């Protein structure tokens, strides 16, 4: 099963559409958004997404109630707050935005999760800490690094790769 990972869209509508196109091309079954949508008007742009979507809030997400409402208008979509524990088969995934560095490090270090997904830094990276796969899909917006990225996560292989949106 392929899972799409995205973070830090920051209202960049064109890159949201590029990410959705890539997720649909790759037949992902689930998309995890690690926060910083920013404005609620971004959420309807995800409507062409064929997969289910689970999200968390980021530090720049202002109108959280309206973001929740926009998510609830789509079957199979949910926004869980600041943290989400997701089970895909026997794989446990922790997702948070990552702006609380102590919490992020504790989740990575404690070994309770197979995968930890976060955003916030806008820096795409994939590494292992013990048995835990840690993935930051980078910034979909491309504002800070100049690179617009997402990630694809293979649940069976417990492997991820970064995809640049072009």
Q: What do the predicted segments below correspond to?
A:
Residues 2-10, 92-98, 133-138, 162:
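Active-site-proximal beta-strand elements of phosphoester/diester hydrolases
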Residues 2-87:
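Core catalytic region of metal-dependent phosphoesterases/phosphodiesterases
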Residues 10-15, 38-41, 61-66, 100-105, ...:
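Active-site environment of divalent metal-dependent phosphoester hydrolases
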Residues 27, 112, 120:
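Conserved functional loop/turn residues at catalytic and ligand-binding sites
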Residues 30, 93, 114-115:
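Short, Asp-centered acidic motifs that coordinate Mg2+ and/or phosphate
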Residues 32-33, 96, 118:
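Redox-cofactor binding/interface segments in oxidoreductases and associated redox assembly factors
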Residues 52-57, 117, 134-139:
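Short hydrophobic/aromatic-enriched beta-strand-loop microsegments
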Residues 80-89, 105-112, 128-130, 135-166:
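Binuclear metal-dependent phosphoesterase catalytic core
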């Amino acid at each position: 099963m392929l899972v799409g990972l995205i973070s830090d869209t920051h209202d960049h509508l064109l890159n949201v559409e590029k990410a959705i196109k890539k997720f649909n091309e790759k037949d992902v079954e689930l998309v995890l958004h690690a926060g910083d949508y920013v404005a609620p008007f971004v959420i309807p742009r995800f409507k062409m997404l064929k997969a289910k979507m689970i999200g968390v809030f980021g530090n720049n997400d202002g109108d959280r109630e309206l973001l929740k409402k926009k998510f609830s208008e789509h079957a199979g979509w949910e926004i869980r707050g600041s943290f989400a524990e997701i089970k895909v088969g026997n794989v446990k995934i922790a997702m948070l935005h990552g702006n609380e560095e102590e919490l992020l490090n504790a989740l990575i270090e404690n070994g309770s999760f197979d995968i930890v997904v976060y955003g916030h830094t806008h820096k795409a990276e994939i590494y292992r800490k013990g048995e835990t796969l840690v993935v930051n899909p980078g910034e979909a917006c491309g504002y800070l690094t100049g690179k617009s990225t997402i990630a694809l996560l293979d649940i069976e292989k417990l492997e991820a790769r970064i995809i640049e949106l072009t």
